[in-house]
UniProtKB/Swiss-Prot annotation:
PANTHER family from the UniProt entry: 4-HYDROXYBENZOATE SOLANESYLTRANSFERASE, PROTOHEME IX FARNESYLTRANSFERASE, MITOCHONDRIAL
Tagged with keyword Nucleus: no
Reactions that this protein is recorded to catalyse: heme b + (2E,6E)-farnesyl diphosphate + H2O = Fe(II)-heme o + diphosphate
Name by which UniProt lists this protein: Protoheme IX farnesyltransferase
Membrane topology reported for the UniProt record: Multi-pass membrane protein
Keywords: Cell membrane, Heme biosynthesis, Membrane, Transferase, Transmembrane, Transmembrane helix
Functional summary from the UniProt entry: Converts heme B (protoheme IX) to heme O by substitution of the vinyl group on carbon 2 of heme B porphyrin ring with a hydroxyethyl farnesyl side group.
GO CC aspect terms: plasma membrane
Protein family (similarity comment): Belongs to the UbiA prenyltransferase family. Protoheme IX farnesyltransferase subfamily.
Transmembrane segments: 27-47, 48-68, 94-114, 117-137, 144-164, 171-191, 216-236, 241-261, 272-292
Encoding gene, per UniProt annotation: ctaB
GO MF term list: protoheme IX farnesyltransferase activity
EC supergroup of this enzyme: transferase
């Protein structure tokens, strides 16, 4: 009986953990670290840890509220039907309360322990994801991912503000990289999930404009992304190394985008989606390495 109770507690904790969309959270925290490391100045390690905790909680808050609001469409989509709310493992009201609570806590702690600018940016990113993307754009326009992608682009900007207590053109460049990355990344996935989006009545770009136009736009945004990714060389310490990495990784990204147009199949789109994740991690890892004099 005691073991059974422990297993139930563990299962509940895991369900609430999944509400936070942990895979997105890892990327959010990693890009925030890049913003902190690339920023001029320094911060006490304990404050840096507190900041990253707040950013992670803020990201999780947006994810939990998103799952609460999207519980109806999650239920009919193959990709999302096993999430905690549609599967019945977590009550919708509990998910909403959980999301709001950790969101408020994350912003409050950031404001008290770090600075008001980073707290304000964190609040804006949460509110943008919930109200602008989830509630307003997602079910209304095929540009949902393009505009809504701004929510996921804030973390390096927040990380920069944690250290500098300011927003600058350098941090905006880091924001812009993720903003340009989001459409080709997500459209590569949505091309393979068109039936899901049709069932859920979500006007994804590929559903409204068709796969041919979507693939062309994947290439367009990929080129814009690669061009944008070169800009951090203007302020990084090891700019030549970074530039080399950005060019090599960017050429591979464009090659995958061209493959999506040329092959027009599930496999090329899946590979594009998978590589786009590796690409962003690698690019921001290069930003970190080129900011701390490791070589």
């Amino acid at each position: 009986m005691y073991i059974s109770a422990l297993l139930n507690v563990e299962s509940t904790i895991l369900d609430f953990w999944h509400l936070l969309k942990p895979r997105i959270m890892y990327l959010v925290v990693f890009t925030a670290i890049a913003g902190m490391v690339a920023a001029p100045g320094s911060i006490h390690p304990f404050l840096a840890l507190i900041s990253l905790m707040c950013i992670a909680l803020g990201s999780g808050s947006a994810g939990a509220i998103n799952m609460w609001y999207d519980r109806d469409i999650d239920l009919v989509m193959e990709r999302t039907k096993n999430r905690p709310i549609p599967s019945g493992r977590v009550f919708a009201e509990s998910a909403l309360e959980f999301g709001i609570t950790i969101g408020i806590l994350s912003v409050f702690i950031m404001a008290i322990a770090v600075n008001y600018i980073s707290a304000a940016l964190l609040a804006v990113s949460i509110l943008f994801y919930v109200f602008v993307y989830t509630i307003w754009l997602k079910r209304r326009t095929p540009q949902n991912i393009v505009i809504g992608g701004a929510a996921g682009a804030f973390p390096p900007m927040i990380g920069w503000a944690v250290v500098t207590d300011s927003v600058s053109w350098e941090s905006f460049i880091l924001f812009l990289i993720i903003f340009m990355w989001t459409p080709p990344h997500f459209w590569a996935l949505s091309l393979n999930r068109s039936e899901d989006y049709v069932k859920a009545s979500i006007p994804m770009f590929n559903v409204i404009h068709g796969p041919k136009k979507t693939r062309k736009h994947i290439l367009i945004y990929s080129i814009l992304l690669v061009l944008t990714s070169l800009l951090p060389a203007l302020f990084l310490k090891k700019s030549l190394f970074y530039l080399s990495m950005a060019i090599i990784e960017g050429c591979v990204f464009i090659w995958f985008a061209i493959s999506v147009i040329r092959l027009k199949n599930h496999s090329s789109q899946k590979k594009m989606f998978s590589y786009s994740i590796s690409y962003l991690f690698s690019l921001f890892a290069s930003i970190i390495f080129c900011s701390i004099d490791l070589f």
